[in-house]
Regions:
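Conserved donor nucleotide-binding strand/loop of the catalytic core
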Residues: 35-38, 49-82
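Short loop->beta transition adjacent to catalytic acidic/histidine clusters or analogous donor-positioning motifs
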Residues: 2-5, 25-38, 47, 60-62
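Hydrophobic helical membrane-anchoring modules
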Residues: 1-3, 169-233
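Donor nucleotide-sugar binding loop of glycosyltransferases
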Residues: 13-16, 44, 72
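A conserved acidic beta->alpha catalytic loop
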Residues: 41-50, 96
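Acceptor/aglycone-binding surface of glycosyltransferases and processive sugar-polymer synthases
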Residues: 67-83, 88-91, 99-175, 202-212, ...
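Short, well-formed alpha-helical segments that are part of the catalytic scaffolds
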Residues: 13-28
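Conserved sequence signature across two-component system core domains
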Residues: 10-11, 38-42
Length: 233
């Protein structure tokens, strides 16, 4: 296993994925890290899969996992399970909304921390997403502990060895496992580092969950987050 595994779920990002992978590869190489980018294609219906396969053929540090569509949460959870042997796991989404500029801040502070995460700023989200973010934060703070601010931020670096026991207990169909993991960081009193990361609007593609479906998904994820808390303790 490499020292760092980047878990990157992708769904219908044909227009962005080549640029995103190029940016992250350049940033990681500049830091001289022993890394692998594991790209999980979650049943994309556009040209995403052939695009990432072409890139992977030229770069052995990019691994492609093609899987049936199951959703963002189950996909990143599979990525975590597949790479529990890595010293570090970093999760980032493939839409380009969070760039690699602040990764060096996380990586350079890793020796003193167990869980390092971004706090999205300049985020131009619709009211519906802001509401679900507030609710998610409240649930995690209430049931796990008030520590991580941006509880669902897909810009997180952590030591899987400290979370392995719990990661394997999270149900595979969990909608937002990152909420639970942020809660675990607080409950287990991990050493947590947080830093602001600039959020930019996506230039291609579109969000997969909108309006009423977003609230239904948020309700399900909050329920799963609460139930896991009582299941484990």
């Amino acid at each position: 296993m490499p020292e760092l595994t980047v878990v990157m779920p992708v769904y219908n990002e044909e227009g962005a994925i080549s640029s995103v992978l190029a940016q992250w590869s350049e940033a990681l190489q500049a830091l001289q890290i022993d890394y692998q980018i594991a790209v999980y294609n979650d049943g994309s219906k556009d040209g995403t899969l052939p695009a990432i396969q072409t890139i992977a053929q030229k770069d052995p540090r990019i691994a492609v996992v093609d899987k049936p569509n199951s959703g963002h949460g189950p996909t990143i959870l599979k990525g975590y399970h597949d790479h529990l042997g890595s010293s570090w796991i970093f999760q980032i989404d493939s839409d380009g909304e969070l760039g690699p500029e602040k990764f060096v801040v996380l990586w350079s502070n890793r020796a003193a921390y167990d869980f390092l995460i971004g706090n999205r700023i300049c985020r131009k989200s619709p009211l519906s997403r802001k509401i679900t973010t507030w609710i998610s934060r409240g649930i995690v703070w209430l049931f796990y502990g008030r520590l991580v601010f941006d509880v669902n931020c897909p810009y997180r670096l952590f030591r899987p060895s400290l979370l392995k026991e719990y990661l394997l207990q999270i149900p595979l169909d969990t909608f937002a496992p990152n909420l639970i993991i942020a809660g675990l960081a607080a409950h287990l009193r991990l050493r947590v580092f947080q830093t602001d990361v600039v959020h930019t609007d996506r230039r291609t593609g579109e969000v997969s969950i909108k309006k009423w479906k977003l609230f239904k998904a948020a309700r399900a994820s909050c329920r799963q987050t609460i139930l896991f808390r009582w299941k484990v303790w």
